[in-house]
UniProtKB/Swiss-Prot annotation:
Record EC number: 3.1.26.4
Cofactors required: Mg(2+)
Positions with a binding annotation for Mg(2+) 2: 10, 134
Cellular component aspect of the GO annotation: cytoplasm
Protein source organism: Escherichia coli O127:H6 (strain E2348/69 / EPEC)
Quaternary structure, from the entry: Monomer.
InterPro entries, alphabetized: RNase_H (IPR050092), RNaseH-like_sf (IPR012337), RNaseH_domain (IPR002156), RNaseH_sf (IPR036397), RNaseHI (IPR022892)
One GO BP: DNA replication, removal of RNA primer
Designated name of the protein: Ribonuclease H
Role: Endonuclease that specifically degrades the RNA of RNA-DNA hybrids.
Gene symbol of the encoding locus: rnhA
Catalytic activity: Endonucleolytic cleavage to 5'-phosphomonoester
CC cofactor note: Binds 1 Mg(2+) ion per subunit. May bind a second metal ion at a regulatory site, or after substrate binding.
Keyword Ribonucleoprotein assigned: no
Residues bound to Mg(2+) 1: 10, 48, 70
Length: 155
């Protein structure tokens, strides 16, 4: 039987692009571990992706996961768009390169053999864990220490 894990995530950006951060909570049998980090120049979508990636990469064995995010970009990307992106060699329907491909590929790899149920929660609507993740992400964004080497300025 797989371990049942809950993950809650959020990303924040002070300006888009600008300093950003992510926050994540991993819960297993009432025990919680939090994750957060801040980047000097990034985007909100990249931080939303990083929150999910870091939490999933922390899992040491195959798990049954309920992952809650307030990002439709992340939820739709992983449940609907990614399959066609991969078939097209990481291109969109109009043959343009997928944005944030480095993180989408990393998220795809982090899924591993986990059974994941992706849940969308409305942001800033009083969901306790989402609010905590938002606080972690915003605090990290206000004190960025890392460089987002995968961030590319759009021209």
């Amino acid at each position: 039987m797989l371990k049942q894990v809950e993950i809650f995530t959020d990303g924040s950006c002070l300006g888009n692009p600008g300093p950003g951060g992510y926050g994540a909570i991993l819960r297993y049998r009432g025990h919680e571990k939090t994750f957060s980090a801040g980047y000097t120049r990034t985007t909100n979508n990249r931080m939303e992706l990083m929150a999910a990636i870091v939490a999933l990469e922390a899992l040491k064995e195959h798990c049954e996961v309920i992952l809650s995010t307030d990002s439709q970009y992340v939820r739709q990307g992983i449940t609907q768009w990614i399959h066609n992106w991969k078939k097209r060699g990481w291109k969109t329907a109009d043959k343009k390169p997928v944005k944030n491909v480095d993180l989408w590929q990393r998220l795809d790899a982090a899924l591993g053999q986990h059974q994941i149920k992706w849940e969308w929660v409305k942001g800033h609507a009083g969901h306790p864990e989402n609010e905590r993740c938002d606080e972690l992400a915003r605090a990290a964004a206000m004190n960025p220490t890392l460089e987002d080497t995968g961030y590319q300025v759009e021209v």
